[in-house]
Amino acid sequence: MTTEKRQILVTAALPYANGPIHLGHMVEHIQADIWVRFQRLKGNDCLFICGEDAHGTAIMITAQKQGLPPEALVAKMHKEHARDLGGFLIEYDNFYTTHSPENRELAELIYTRLKDKGDIFAKTISQAYDPVKEIFLPDRFIRGTCPRCGAKDQYGDVCEVCGATYSPTELIDPVSALSGAKPIEKNSEHFFFSLNRYTQLLKKWIDAGHLQPQVANKLKEWFSEDLKPWDISRDAPYFGFEIPHAANKYFYVWLDAPIGYMASLKNLSKQRPSVNFDAYWKEGSQTELYHFVGKDIVYFHALFWPAMLSSAGFRLPTAIYVHGYLTVNGQKMSKSRGTFITAHHYLDHLSPEYLRYYYAAKLSAQVEDIDLNLDDFIQRVNADLIGKYVNLASRCAGFITKNFGGKLANELPEPDLYESFLQTEQTITDYYESLNYSKAVRVIMSLADRANQYIDAKKPWALAKEINQEAQVQAVCTQGLNLFKILTTYLKPILPVTAKKVEQFLNCDELNFANLKTPLLDHSVNPFEPLMQRLLPETAAQLTHE
C-alpha cells in the first residue's frame, strides 16, 4: 500500500534586519528545520521558506546610525543572517526579503482587497512626536519613569521591572530615545483594519485545532472584549512600502511582514517552475501550510494574519506551531553576563549539530521555555552523541575493516533484536510529527543503550583473540553496524551532516524511512573516520567569553 505524498509549505518567522541572529532565534529555525527534514525523509514534498524582515522605524534608525541607506543595511544583514542560518544547517528553499517587488505587489493587492471589502477605514489619532527629529515615535523609542512602580528608563509601552503595560502618555517624564527631547502630541490620519468583523471566523478557526491548546486558550482571552481595529499605517519618515493613493503613508511593518511568506514563495516559483504559488495560497487549497513562531508574535500570526488572509480571499494556515523562549544557565540572555550568544560566535567554536541535538533533546509540543545549561550541554553531547551513538560504530567498525577487509557478514546473528529496533519506527515518527522531539530522542537513546549492551555482552574484542571465532566476530559487528544504521536514520533530521558521513562510511544509499528495514549484508563498508569530537568544557566555556 502506498500513501499519497503530502504537499507541505513550512515557514519560520522572519529575522529582523537590524541585528545579528542569536541562539534564541535558533530554537525556532532548528525546530522547523528538523520537522522539514523529517517530512522529506518520509517522502513528502515539503517546501521551507523564510526571509529578512526588512521594514520599520528601527531599521531606518539603525541604518542612520551606521551611516547607511536602509536598503544597504538590509542587504548586509540578509547576507549575515543567511550565512548563520546556513551554518546551523538550516536548509531553506528560499531565504528572501520583505523589501522586494513581490512583497510590494502582494501587500498592495491584499490592501486593495481589504479596502474593496470595506475592511479599511481612516481615523485621526494623536501620537507622540519628536519635535527635534520630526518623526512620530513608536512606543519603543520613548523612555521614561514607569507610572506603576517608578522604575526609571523604561519603554513607552511596558515596564521591564514590574511588567506593567501602559500608553506612552501615562509615562512619567517621557523623552525621545532619538533626541532626548520631550515628545509632543500630534494628530495624524491613520488607516485601520476592522479586525472585529472577523471575530466569529477567528473563534471558529481557533476552536478547530489549528493551534496548541495553550495558545488557543490564551487567544480566547482576547475575545472577552471586542477585538480592536488594527492600525496598519505609519507616517513618513518610515522605511517600508508606501500605501497606494495615500501621500506620506506607509504600510506598518507587521502588515507586510507575514505577506513576506507569500512573497518568498512567489519568488521561488520564478526560480523553480515546478512550484505553483496558487496551489499553496489559493482559497480552498488542499496543500498544508505551517508557520513556526515564537510566543511573542502569536497575536500577529493567529489573529491579524488569518483575518487578513480571509478578507483578501486566500487560504488560512493548517497550523501555527508556537515555541517558548531560550534562557542560558537559567537566566534571560544577557550581554553583561556573557550569555547573549550570537549564532556566528557559537559557530566559531562548536559544531552546529551539538546544539541541534541539545535543542531537540529539550523541545516538546508545549509552549515551554528551554534552558541552555552549558554544563548539561557538555554532559548531554558527550554522554549521548559520543558515548552512546558514535561509540557503537567505533566499537564495531575496526574489526570489520582490519579483520574482514570491510566486508559485513551475510546474515544477522540476532534478527529479532534488529526487528525490535524497527518496531519503534512508528513511535519515533509520531513524536517527530507532533514536535515531541525530546520524546523521540529519549527513545532513540534507549535503543543506543540496548545496542551497546548487546556489544558489551558479546565482547567482540575478546572473541577476536579466540581461535575459530572469526565468523562470530564478523556477525556481532555486522549486527552492531546495522543497529547503528537504524539509529542514524532516526537521528538524520537532527544530525544531517553526521548522517551523510555515516552513509559514506556504510557505502550505502541515502538513509530514509523507505529503506530503513533492509539490513546491509554481504556488503562492503569503507574505513571508519571519526564522526564527532568529544566536547571539552574549556571549548564550551568560550561561548560566554568574547
From Swiss-Prot:
The entry marks the following residues as binding Zn(2+), namely 146, 149, 159, 162
Q: Which Pfam families match?
A: Anticodon_3, tRNA-synt_1g
Catalytic activity field? tRNA(Met) + L-methionine + ATP = L-methionyl-tRNA(Met) + AMP + diphosphate
- List, alphabetically, the PROSITE patterns matched: AA_TRNA_LIGASE_I
Q: Name one GO molecular function term.
A: metal ion binding
- Show where the record puts the motif 'HIGH' region: 15-25
Q: Which HAMAP family match?
A: Met_tRNA_synth_type1
Q: Which family does it belong to?
A: Belongs to the class-I aminoacyl-tRNA synthetase family. MetG type 1 subfamily.
Q: What is this protein called?
A: Methionine--tRNA ligase
State the organism's lineage: Bacteria, Pseudomonadati, Pseudomonadota, Gammaproteobacteria, Legionellales
